[in-house]
């Protein structure tokens, strides 16, 4: 009895399998809303991730601009530093005037009494020597004469001197006889002081001829180089401002 029952059950199962196997299976359409939503969601997420990644990886414009400015500032400062460290071998007229304005010498090159310096308004060493020979005799043998024009010529022709180029400009403009007295304010006295410092010593007796041409040069010389003990003035120049200036302090000697 059990055998026929088992056969019946097996037959029923086979029948059900055939029926179920034969039914068409339900499939999602190719463009179903669910599928589109899934795809859009996936693409949108990917785009957001990409944008976020770009924002993180790419430097901002402000940062680039700031870096460029900092780099420029560093470059400029470096160039300026190199320019400052570079030795300057020449000076223009404007630069020299700025140097003179900023120069505040506390003491003269030679303290008062260390050297004996006299001025002469005679135009040359020869004329000054001739006049002094009559009045002082052999005493002039101890004197050393200085012609400012020759001093300026010395520095004008001194190779690679910082004032060589500027002095040559004035030489071409004014000529050999007068250019020394047309230099920028203070330059003649400055170069005279430099020459005195390089060539003379304590105890020397000096006469500077054809100098000064103005009270300003006279006072500048005494402030920067040394106090003058006397000035020799030809009679024809006794009415000049320079002569009157030194007469007030009892240093003018009319010759």
Curated annotation (Swiss-Prot):
Primary subcellular site in the record, as a coarse category: mitochondrion
Q: Which cysteines are joined by disulfide bonds?
A: none
Which Gene Ontology CC terms are recorded? mitochondrial membrane
Q: Which UniProt keywords apply?
A: Membrane, Mitochondrion, Transit peptide, Transmembrane, Transmembrane helix
Which domain of life does this protein belong to?
Eukaryota
Kindly give the membrane topology term recorded for this protein.
Answer: Single-pass membrane protein
- List residues traversing the bilayer: 64-82
Return the similarity comment. Belongs to the AIM36 family.
Q: What is this protein called?
A: Altered inheritance of mitochondria protein 36, mitochondrial
Q: What is the native source organism of this protein?
A: Saccharomyces cerevisiae (strain YJM789) (Baker's yeast)
Which lineage is the organism of this entry classified under, starting from the top rank? Eukaryota, Fungi, Dikarya, Ascomycota, Saccharomycotina
